[in-house]
Amino acid sequence: MSVLGLGTDIVEIERIRSQLERGGDRLAKRILTESELAIFVGSGQRELYLAKRFAAKEAVAKALGTGIGRGVSFQHIETYSDEFGAPCVRLSDGALERMQQLGGSQIRLSIADERHYAVATAILC
Protein backbone atom coordinates (compact mmCIF):
# COMPACT_ATOMS: atom_id res chain seq x y z
CA MET A 1 0.00 0.00 0.00
CA SER A 2 1.58 3.27 -1.08
CA VAL A 3 1.06 6.73 0.35
CA LEU A 4 -0.76 8.98 -2.11
CA GLY A 5 -1.16 12.02 0.09
CA LEU A 6 -0.26 13.42 3.49
CA GLY A 7 -1.82 16.30 5.38
CA THR A 8 -1.31 17.86 8.82
CA ASP A 9 -3.07 20.71 10.56
CA ILE A 10 -2.81 22.39 13.96
CA VAL A 11 -5.49 24.55 15.58
CA GLU A 12 -5.27 26.84 18.58
CA ILE A 13 -8.13 25.79 20.88
CA GLU A 14 -8.49 29.30 22.34
CA ARG A 15 -9.18 30.66 18.85
CA ILE A 16 -12.07 28.22 18.46
CA ARG A 17 -13.35 29.08 21.95
CA SER A 18 -13.35 32.80 21.03
CA GLN A 19 -15.22 32.15 17.80
CA LEU A 20 -17.84 30.11 19.65
CA GLU A 21 -18.28 32.91 22.19
CA ARG A 22 -18.67 35.55 19.46
CA GLY A 23 -20.69 33.63 16.90
CA GLY A 24 -22.45 30.90 18.84
CA ASP A 25 -22.74 27.65 16.92
CA ARG A 26 -22.36 29.29 13.50
CA LEU A 27 -18.81 27.97 13.02
CA ALA A 28 -19.79 24.48 14.18
CA LYS A 29 -22.70 24.38 11.73
CA ARG A 30 -20.37 25.34 8.89
CA ILE A 31 -17.73 22.73 9.72
CA LEU A 32 -19.61 19.75 11.15
CA THR A 33 -21.94 17.25 9.48
CA GLU A 34 -25.30 16.55 11.13
CA SER A 35 -24.02 13.53 13.07
CA GLU A 36 -20.90 15.42 14.19
CA LEU A 37 -23.05 18.38 15.22
CA ALA A 38 -25.20 16.11 17.41
CA ILE A 39 -22.06 14.98 19.27
CA PHE A 40 -20.81 18.57 19.51
CA VAL A 41 -24.07 19.79 21.07
CA GLY A 42 -23.86 17.12 23.78
CA SER A 43 -20.16 17.56 24.42
CA GLY A 44 -18.89 18.98 27.69
CA GLN A 45 -15.81 20.31 25.84
CA ARG A 46 -17.32 21.86 22.75
CA GLU A 47 -14.32 23.99 21.80
CA LEU A 48 -11.99 20.97 22.03
CA TYR A 49 -14.33 18.77 19.99
CA LEU A 50 -14.66 21.44 17.30
CA ALA A 51 -10.93 22.24 17.22
CA LYS A 52 -10.07 18.57 16.74
CA ARG A 53 -12.64 18.13 13.96
CA PHE A 54 -11.48 21.33 12.25
CA ALA A 55 -7.86 20.10 12.32
CA ALA A 56 -8.89 16.65 11.10
CA LYS A 57 -10.88 17.97 8.15
CA GLU A 58 -8.13 20.39 7.14
CA ALA A 59 -5.57 17.56 7.33
CA VAL A 60 -7.74 15.31 5.16
CA ALA A 61 -8.29 18.07 2.60
CA LYS A 62 -4.53 18.65 2.45
CA ALA A 63 -3.92 14.91 1.97
CA LEU A 64 -6.34 15.07 -0.96
CA GLY A 65 -4.21 17.88 -2.41
CA THR A 66 -7.02 20.41 -2.56
CA GLY A 67 -7.40 21.97 0.85
CA ILE A 68 -10.90 23.15 1.68
CA GLY A 69 -12.35 24.64 -1.47
CA ARG A 70 -11.73 23.58 -5.06
CA GLY A 71 -14.58 21.07 -4.90
CA VAL A 72 -14.01 19.83 -1.34
CA SER A 73 -15.96 21.27 1.59
CA PHE A 74 -16.01 20.59 5.32
CA GLN A 75 -19.35 18.84 4.80
CA HIS A 76 -17.73 16.29 2.44
CA ILE A 77 -15.46 15.04 5.24
CA GLU A 78 -17.02 13.33 8.25
CA THR A 79 -15.12 12.00 11.26
CA TYR A 80 -16.29 9.23 13.55
CA SER A 81 -14.76 6.74 15.97
CA ASP A 82 -14.47 3.01 15.30
CA GLU A 83 -15.34 0.37 17.90
CA PHE A 84 -11.95 0.90 19.58
CA GLY A 85 -12.28 4.69 19.69
CA ALA A 86 -9.82 5.32 16.85
CA PRO A 87 -10.67 8.27 14.59
CA CYS A 88 -11.94 7.39 11.12
CA VAL A 89 -13.05 9.35 8.07
CA ARG A 90 -16.05 9.02 5.78
CA LEU A 91 -15.86 10.98 2.52
CA SER A 92 -18.67 12.09 0.22
CA ASP A 93 -19.22 14.25 -2.85
CA GLY A 94 -16.14 16.22 -3.95
CA ALA A 95 -13.83 14.69 -1.33
CA LEU A 96 -14.76 11.14 -2.35
CA GLU A 97 -14.38 12.00 -6.03
CA ARG A 98 -10.92 13.45 -5.40
CA MET A 99 -9.79 10.36 -3.46
CA GLN A 100 -10.98 8.15 -6.33
CA GLN A 101 -9.19 10.36 -8.90
CA LEU A 102 -5.96 9.85 -6.96
CA GLY A 103 -6.50 6.09 -6.81
CA GLY A 104 -6.93 6.06 -3.04
CA SER A 105 -9.03 3.61 -1.10
CA GLN A 106 -8.68 4.76 2.50
CA ILE A 107 -7.54 7.56 4.77
CA ARG A 108 -5.74 6.95 8.04
CA LEU A 109 -6.32 9.67 10.61
CA SER A 110 -4.64 10.62 13.87
CA ILE A 111 -6.00 13.39 16.12
CA ALA A 112 -4.38 14.68 19.31
CA ASP A 113 -4.60 17.64 21.66
CA GLU A 114 -2.40 19.15 24.33
CA ARG A 115 -3.56 22.06 26.45
CA HIS A 116 -3.55 24.86 23.84
CA TYR A 117 -3.58 23.00 20.53
CA ALA A 118 -5.36 20.30 18.57
CA VAL A 119 -3.45 18.57 15.78
CA ALA A 120 -4.37 16.03 13.13
CA THR A 121 -2.51 14.07 10.49
CA ALA A 122 -4.15 12.27 7.57
CA ILE A 123 -2.54 9.74 5.24
CA LEU A 124 -4.23 8.89 1.94
CA CYS A 125 -3.49 5.33 0.82
UniProtKB/Swiss-Prot annotation:
A GO BP entry: fatty acid biosynthetic process
Protein name: Holo-[acyl-carrier-protein] synthase
MF annotations from Gene Ontology: holo-[acyl-carrier-protein] synthase activity; magnesium ion binding
Names of the cofactor(s): Mg(2+)
Cell compartment(s), UniProt: Cytoplasm
Listed Pfam families: ACPS
Source organism per UniProt: Shewanella amazonensis (strain ATCC BAA-1098 / SB2B)
Gene Ontology CC annotations of this record: cytoplasm
